[in-house]
Amino acid sequence: MLVIVGGTTTGILFLGPRYLPRYLPILGINGASAMKKSYFLANFLACLGLLAISSSSALLITSSPSLLAASATAPSAMTAIFTSFPLPWGSTTSSLNLFSGRLRSISLRFTATSTLCVKLRGLARALASFTASTIFCLSKAILDIPP
């Protein structure tokens, strides 16, 4: 039989709480809250798709389930990440830099990707070059860039 006398058994210790048992749960709660916030931020950024990796030879295309699978809280998921093949398989990049007065410049980069067939490589290159030249002509007319 347990006898309680004047509230001396409240707390973690038999004679009541001391400094360490009083502050230890608070530290644990703060740590768990910080971990929850960091996981939430990682998931939020992954959902927005701010993970962008690009290079001149290949373009990385990811879906939102694969980005969520890469976060720390998600279980191991079997999702596919699609990447385009390098230039011989139909990916081409056309870059364009526009310079106007007072150190203003516009940099445009167009990538056309075709992984269906090797024969479509020429079409992808022509599409990217045509898009870049069209944007160049339009921006030249809008910005009034001298020839």
Swiss-Prot record:
Q: Could you tell me the keywords of this UniProt record?
A: Cell membrane, Membrane, Transmembrane, Transmembrane helix
How does the UniProt record describe the way this protein sits in the membrane? Multi-pass membrane protein
**What residue intervals traverse the membrane?**
41-61, 67-87
Localization in the cell: Cell membrane
**What cellular-component terms does GO give this entry?**
plasma membrane
Protein name, per record:
Uncharacterized protein PH2001
Q: Whose protein is this, by species?
A: Pyrococcus horikoshii (strain ATCC 700860 / DSM 12428 / JCM 9974 / NBRC 100139 / OT-3)
